[in-house]
Every structure is written in structure tokens, then in C-alpha cells.
Regions:
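Positively charged, solvent-exposed patches that mediate nucleic-acid binding
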Residues: 1-112
Length: 112
């Protein structure tokens, strides 16, 4: 479970990261990253739209993304704000494929 300090909760933060952050698209998602320069753990936010599936499917995808990000946190820059937007294909993807795709995107954009 991501700690409260590792979550992006405000809508204005989501908007600024998506609009001004650098991004990298994978086959299953898009990673948006802004480096704030602060000395705190990276923060994560997730966008999983209704196009991904019903509520159960969306929450499953969100839980998978959270687990992947928690695992990748030690390899990321302190102060990075990361928003991951899931594509509909992520609902059908195997966990290993989703993990590979997300970790590759995070390492290219937010690695320490």
C-alpha cells in the first residue's frame, strides 16, 4: 500500500503533471513525470478511465499499478511526481507484461 505521503490526491496536481510533465508512452500506459526537486519520496497518481472496463476491472488495474510503483520506488528520484494513465489494453494484460511496461517507462523518465 502506498503511504499517504506517496500519493497525489489533488486534482490541480494531476493537471499540472499531465500538462507540464515529460511523458513516455508504453503499449499499456503513459507515464507523466515532473521532478519537483524536493527531498521526499516520489509521489504517484493513477488515471484509469471507464474505457478500461467496469469498476472491478478498473480497480484491479489500479491495484496492480500501485503494487508495481511501490516495488519501483527505491529506484526513482526523490521528489519525482508520477502520474500513470492506463490504456484499455492494460485490463487484459498479464501482470508480468504490465510490470515490464511500467518499470521500463519509470526507469526512462524518473530513475535516480
Amino acid at each position: 500500500v502506498l503511504a499517504r505521503t506517496q500519493r497525489i490526491t489533488r486534482g490541480i496536481d494531476y493537471r499540472s503533471i499531465v500538462r507540464r510533465g515529460s511523458r513516455r508512452a508504453g503499449a499499456l500506459h503513459v507515464v507523466h513525470v515532473i521532478d519537483t526537486g524536493e527531498s521526499r519520496p516520489p509521489r504517484f497518481g493513477f488515471i484509469v478511465s471507464k474505457a478500461v472496463g467496469n469498476a472491478v476491472t478498473r480497480n484491479t488495474v489500479r491495484r496492480r499499478l500501485k503494487a508495481i510503483c511501490l516495488e519501483a520506488t527505491p529506484r526513482l528520484r526523490p521528489g519525482a511526481d508520477v502520474v500513470i494513465r492506463a490504456f484499455p489494453a492494460s485490463a487484459e494484460a498479464a501482470y508480468a507484461d504490465l510490470r515490464h511496461d511500467v518499470v521500463r517507462g519509470l526507469e526512462r523518465k524518473a530513475a535516480a
